[in-house]
Amino acid sequence: MLGEIESNMKKTFRIKCYKLDLGVSLCFLIYLLVSLIIPPLIGTHEKSDTQAEVSITTSERVCLIDNNEDALLWRLRLIRSAQEEIILSTFDFRADSSGTDVIAALWGAAERGVQVRLIIDGINAQLHLSGSDEFQALAAHDNVEVKFYNPIRLTQLWTVNYRCHDKYLIIDRSTYLMGGRNTSDLFLGSGGTSRQNIDRDIVVYNGGFTTASANTLLEYFDRIWLLDTNRAFNAAAENHRVKKATAILASRWTENNDSKRF
């Protein structure tokens, strides 16, 4: 008799656990579906902000960059030329060969007193960049600020597709590079991967003077930089791995800086 009662109690307990698991799974599924189908609730702007007709004559000069090797060299040269400020926004930044060249160049600029601000799409940064010791060493520098745009948050899954595909580099608030290339071997350099994307960049400059288009880009960057959806990236406290990575960046930058390619 007692055995039968105990058996029934266990059976009842298993049924309750099953119902609880089913209920939790169903609630999560409903939450996920709602997150994917509800319309955006933030970021409403007037259409006139993006559809205004503009007619301006300027003295700006434009250089077209079609070659991936040139695309890397232009980035490194521009970063090396910076005297006051560097702004970099990108969708995908990886610490591969070309990416580490850029990280080393940014570190070298920060070392000579240039203020560096980076904003990187949150998903790709979390997946491919935040665990890099070299990137940690860069982000730990006193002259460097890093933000991740809209990183994944389980409490706001409906924002998971709100991505930042901007790709531009601004030097001293005057010269800038803009295009379709991310910061990785897939888009930059020539020897880091067996296949590469074909893309294009432009460099816009005006003899060191701030241009109308540069001002527009800076205003846009400031708006994106201050969004509440961004999260500051806090680098790991200085440890032996960061110190080792810093030495690697210093060596990489010295090697690239002495190269005849630049």
Predicted regions and their residues:
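Charged, low-complexity intrinsically disordered terminal segments
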Residues: 2-144, 154-166, 171-262
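Short, internal strand/loop/helix patches
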Residues: 147
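Short loop/turn segments at beta-alpha junctions that line or gate ligand-sensing/allosteric surfaces
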Residues: 151
